[in-house]
């Protein structure tokens, strides 16, 4: 190994060699991205980026316990490693004992591709997609609508090495496509999004046709007041709600009485029935089409993550099984405090157990209700009930006698995803979906459409 190498696996090895701490974890994330943007039926920009982020976690043993220090920097080269290591060690020496301290993980076999070059994306990922998008521009132009949006593809190669002997590597592709169609006067708008690993399974023509149909629905405008309505939540909206629920499902917080998963009188609600529908909410690092890291990658400690757990193998986990709460997210530390199993968070989320009905079939079986496009600007109101507020966007449609009667105004909603699971009367066919609100952080989801008989539209919103 040379002192000036920039190969990721050699960078992490050199970083470990420089460490003087009692323990050390090094995470190198090699990023590459390719993107396209368009407006008014024409491409506007495209680009490719490359980058590296190096995270050093130093652990220092003391009389009162083990402290940790974490420092991350981007664009790090071999010549800058020592200062980064010393900064992490200084942070550890200046910190008190880490509450989540545990021995570093051992015994995980080395990844066979650990010494390989990082995976990279490029504009070639759009070779088939870009011409198909151009054809959609032409159809939209001829149909009197304008398309706006972007496509982004990212590949992150993560190299994780520790002083305890772990040498792990994971390549994570992540693609998102968001498409807006607008009427020329900007009074009507519709949205569709897709999550993809490689842009080979997205169809711009089908998305444009879907948006054209929705703009047609919006030609008839109907004003509705705030209130509770039977509502069909599409998979993207279900994903946005349940992802936030997953982020709020830390075992320790629940055991200490701070969340919706806290049991009155103490303990957690694990074992309680949350839904009368036979729904199963689960994560699996090996789920086809939604694959994610099969081991813990923790750049910092928090409610649902511990830097001491880096490299811990991940397994398929059922958070809710058949409507019953089975697990909360638990690190080794929080599992020890609560007596619950070690169940770290995993980078995908799947809800299944519904019927085989499509959203269109559920619409056809609706006497009167609302059909949403997506949710937006979701914020927490009350952690004790997980009450969330947010807005509908880009199309809310009134369904009467199995058909869309027209577009209604947007609303602000106030709902708890946990309560919604309990009140849901139907779930349809599970499909891959892109959560619109959380797509910058979480894209690997598969959800069904869900029918709620009394969704709370708390006030009218004037947005398009």
Sequence positions of predicted segments:
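Dual-mode signal for accessory low-complexity, basic/Gly-rich regions
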Residues: 110, 266-464
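Active-site bordering "gate/hinge" segments
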Residues: 1-306, 321-322, 347, 403, ...
């Amino acid at each position: 190994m040379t002192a000036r190498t920039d190969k990721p696996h050699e960078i992490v090895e050199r970083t470990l060699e420089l460490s003087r701490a009692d323990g050390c974890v090094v995470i190198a994330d090699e990023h590459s991205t390719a993107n396209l943007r368009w407006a008014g039926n024409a491409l506007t920009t495209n680009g490719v980026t490359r980058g590296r982020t190096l995270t050093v976690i130093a652990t220092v043993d003391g009389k009162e316990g083990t402290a940790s220090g974490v420092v991350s920097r981007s664009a790090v080269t071999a010549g800058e490693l020592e200062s980064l290591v010393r900064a992490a060690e200084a942070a550890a020496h200046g910190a008190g004992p880490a509450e989540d301290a545990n021995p570093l993980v051992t015994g995980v076999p080395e990844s066979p591709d650990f010494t390989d070059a990082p995976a990279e994306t490029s504009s070639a990922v759009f070779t088939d997609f870009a011409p198909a998008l151009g054809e959609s521009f032409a159809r939209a132009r001829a149909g009197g609508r304008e398309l706006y949006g972007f496509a982004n593809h990212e590949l992150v190669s993560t190299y994780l090495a520790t002083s305890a002997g772990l040498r792990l590597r994971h390549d994570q592709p992540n693609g998102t496509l968001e498409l807006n169609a607008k009427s020329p006067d900007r009074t009507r708008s519709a949205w569709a999004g897709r999550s993809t690993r490689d842009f080979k399974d997205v169809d711009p023509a089908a998305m444009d046709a879907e948006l054209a149909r929705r703009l047609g629905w919006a030609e008839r405008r109907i004003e509705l007041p705030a209130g509770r309505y039977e509502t069909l939540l599409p998979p993207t909206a279900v994903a946005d709600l349940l992802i936030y629920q997953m982020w709020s499902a830390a075992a320790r917080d629940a055991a200490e009485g701070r969340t919706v998963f806290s049991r009155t009188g103490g303990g957690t609600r694990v074992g309680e029935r949350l839904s009368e529908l036979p729904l199963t909410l689960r994560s699996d690092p090996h789920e086809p089409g939604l694959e994610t890291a099969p081991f813990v990658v923790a750049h910092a400690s928090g409610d649902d993550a511990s830097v001491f757990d880096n490299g811990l193998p991940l397994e398929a986990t059922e958070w809710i099984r058949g409507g019953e709460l089975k697990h909360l997210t638990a690190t080794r530390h929080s599992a020890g405090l609560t007596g619950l199993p070690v169940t770290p968070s995993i980078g995908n989320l799947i809800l299944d157990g519904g019927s085989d009905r499509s959203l269109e079939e559920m619409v056809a079986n609706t006497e009167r209700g609302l059909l949403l496009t997506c949710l937006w600007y979701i914020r927490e109101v009350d952690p004790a009930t997980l009450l969330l507020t947010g807005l509908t966007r880009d199309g809310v449609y009134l369904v009467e006698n199995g058909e869309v009667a027209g577009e209604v105004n947007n609303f602000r909603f106030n709902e708890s995803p946990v309560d919604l699971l309990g009140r849901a009367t139907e779930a349809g066919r599970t499909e891959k979906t892109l959560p619109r609100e959380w797509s910058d952080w979480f894209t690997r989801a598969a959800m069904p459409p869900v029918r709620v008989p009394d969704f709370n539209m708390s006030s009218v919103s004037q947005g398009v």
